[in-house]
């Protein structure tokens, strides 16, 4: 699954993000919905405003083994029918493989940054 990279990330963070993504056989692409301002609405935005390095990344909309457009259609369906509604919960048919990959990715990027003496 591709990852989405927000342009506000610092250079060393971006370098580590690309390294780990490549090791996982993944690609990093720009935010597919920048008009929604996800980075600016995030919990870590106040830290980033004050110069604290912030990793802003998330799962994309392309899925391995699915046709182009499948992920966007599912995302649009979820947003229209479930997002911030009583039905907004984990569904039994959700494939969490990408979420596991994301957790491994974030951990490894964070670990490598923690081992670095510069930002």
Name these PLM-found stretches.
Residues 1-80:
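Metal-dependent peptidase/peptidase-like ectodomains
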Residues 58-119:
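His/Asp/Glu-rich mid-to-C-terminal helical/loop segments that flank catalytic regions of hydrolases
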